[in-house]
Design a protein with these regions (language model features):
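Interdomain hinge/lid region at the active-site interface
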Residues: 113-117, 123
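Acidic, divalent-metal-coordinating active-site segment for phosphoryl/phosphodiester hydrolysis
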Residues: 41-47
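Hydrophobic alpha-helical segments typical of transmembrane helices
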Residues: 20-23, 32, 81-84, 104-107, ...
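Structural motif
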Residues: 51-52, 127
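Terminal peptide-recognition signature
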Residues: 24, 48, 85, 124
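CoA-thioester-processing core
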Residues: 1-37, 51, 66, 70
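C-terminal long alpha-helix characteristic of the crotonase
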Residues: 1-5, 45, 54-102, 109-113, ...
Length: 135
């Protein structure tokens, strides 16, 4: 709730490094990215949430419990599927839509050939929690 975010490098005579000038305009509206990148403006947590830079805003005492809850939720999912979905999302955003769809199809073909896929679908039918092995 009390966090402030920004890319203040231009106020120091620098440009943001580590891909900031490339990643930020891909993550939020370009005009908002320009405002942050070109003026070194800082924003509060609510504004970061409003523009889609963060997924949620929580009080400081709930930051770690919330992060742990999110991590636990992700860990309950099939690790190979999570990895493939992440790869499709990150790589796919950087390519034309048709290429991204092809990548998604190939990754899905791989995932559906794994033991984890069989475990996940079997557990669903049997109404139990899956036990994934990353295989």
């Amino acid at each position: 709730e009390k966090s402030r975010l920004g890319v203040p490098e231009v106020t120091l005579g620098l440009i943001p490094g580590d891909g900031g000038t490339q990643r930020l305009p891909r993550a939020i509206p370009r005009c908002k990215a320009a405002e942050l990148l070109l003026m070194g403006k800082m924003i509060d947590a609510q504004e970061a949430y409003r523009i889609g830079l963060v997924n949620t805003v929580v009080p400081v005492e709930k930051v770690m419990p919330t992060a742990k809850e999110w991590a636990e939720q992700m860990c309950r999912c099939g690790p190979l599927a999570v990895r493939a979905a992440k790869q499709a999302m990150l790589r796919g955003c950087e390519m034309p839509l048709e290429d991204g769809l092809r990548l998604e199809y190939m990754l899905n073909a791989y995932v559906t050939s794994t033991e984890d896929f069989t475990e996940g679908t079997t557990a669903f039918v049997e109404k139990r929690k899956p036990v994934y092995k990353g295989k």
